[in-house]
Amino acid sequence: MDIAGLIPGASKGKGLGNRFLDDARQADALIHIVDAAGSTDTEGRPVIPGIGDPLFDVQFVEEELDQWLASILERDWNKLVREADNQKMKLEHTIASRLSGLSIKETDIAHTIAELGLSRARANGWSENDILRFCKKLRDRSKPIIIAANKADLHSAQLNIHKIRDTRKNVVPCSSELEVMLRRAAKKKKIEYLPGDSRFRINDTAIMNEQQKQALQKASAFLNKYGSTGVQEIINRTIFNLLRFIVVYPVEDELKLTDRKGNALPDAHLLPVNSTPRDLAEKIHAELGKGFLYAIDARSKMRLGADYKLKNNDVIKIVSATSSSR
């Protein structure tokens, strides 16, 4: 989902801060698109390229999210700790209840407490700094951020990309402008190009003016330098690296790898790592999951049980009592 922009002070309601934070609470990961060329200021206003500071943008977004989480817990921290003590509940369970609706798992809370060496038994002694440290680490674990260093095709972006990479590990240089240009050229049959490709081919019949030729030369140089425009790469890295999803292909015919209409590999489902054939069946349809009997690995033709751990790019036939297969 696309969410509202953020400016300093969002955790206190400045600008569209409340809307941003409401959107962000639903997210499992965040792609932070920054102007790597430094051609906008902190409030998104155009400036001369190189004047803006994208590293500041990266830092303040993280800080606003951390402050927002901390404000939720600090509001009545002592009461929260007493509730955990009085009801004999684990501290992480009580915190998870307070943060309900934020897509934060209780296990992530428990791991964060342990990693920071914070005391569960003496949680009422946590300082404001302890709570902020906890929220920072929890946010990093439960809502990881990947940086899309956009406008990387501009000269002023190079130094800024190095600066961001010196302090952040998940950074992808990209050019949304070049990606749009390549997609439009492909749509008009001037080139052959698929999102994420490291190169494109100019069609023999393509008629282009000098400006279009220069634009393609610029795109080619960018692809040679970075391997892609970065747009598809950042989506792939978010899904497969940060969120650790796998892609699985359900089929009706495990021999021809088709659905009942004869379409080859018609569907692809994203599932969390360690998902099972039953999980896949339930995602396709609740009734299919209820009647799940077994699955078949289309490659090996082996029968798979309900608890088998699916692997990335598995092609699976589901056999169910409620429907012969999917």
Residue positions per predicted region:
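Switch II of P-loop NTPase G domains
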Residues: M1-I31, A37-F60, G125-K136, S323-R326
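Structural signature of the urease/amidohydrolase superfamily beta/alpha-barrel
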Residues: D28, D314-I316
